[in-house]
A protein has these predicted regions:
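Short, small-residue-biased leader/transition segments that mark boundaries at the very start
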Residues: 1-5
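Short catalytic/signature loops enriched in Gly
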Residues: 58-150
Length: 150
């Protein structure tokens, strides 16, 4: 019952913030782990890990693209989805690194299911298709278009 009231208050606050943003013609920065809020109020999204932006794009880029940083995939994998027949959620394994002693290379490599040697050694460049940017060695050479296989 308590969660119902929390959601109602949250919806009212978000509505007031959106109205104020529209009335003043200004921008708003929303910092949250709640992807439902992101989907409701954001036009552009930046996903951060260990203090760095590892993926950014339009709301559509982040919520509908098949290409994602492994951390972003993990965030979506930890959300219940009634449209997908999944027996279990797939949360991100491991713990955040110590911010005072970040690992070399990609800061996510210790938790990444796709970790390669280069991930441990070299910080990834930012790969972009114009509106969607991903900082991950998996996307080296990515132009935003899915390669067709024959």
């Amino acid at each position: 019952l308590g969660d119902v009231y929390k959601r109602q208050i949250q919806a009212q606050v978000l509505s007031m913030m959106s109205d104020l943003r529209d009335k003043l013609g200004t921008a708003m920065i929303m910092i949250t782990h709640d992807l439902g809020i992101v989907a409701q109020v954001c036009d552009k999204v930046a996903v951060m890990y260990a203090g760095q932006i590892i993926e950014s794009g339009t709301l559509e880029d982040i919520f509908t693209s098949e290409e994602h940083h492994p951390y972003t995939k993990g965030l979506f994998g930890a959300i219940p989805n009634l449209k997908v027949d999944a027996r279990r959620l797939s949360p991100i394994e491991g713990l955040m690194p110590d911010p005072s002693n970040l690992p070399s290379g990609c800061h996510f490599h210790d938790r990444c299911p796709h970790c390669m040697d280069i991930c441990r050694e070299q910080e990834p460049a930012i790969y972009s298709n114009g509106t969607h940017c991903i900082a991950c060695h998996l996307y080296d050479g990515w132009d935003g278009k899915k390669e067709e296989t024959t």
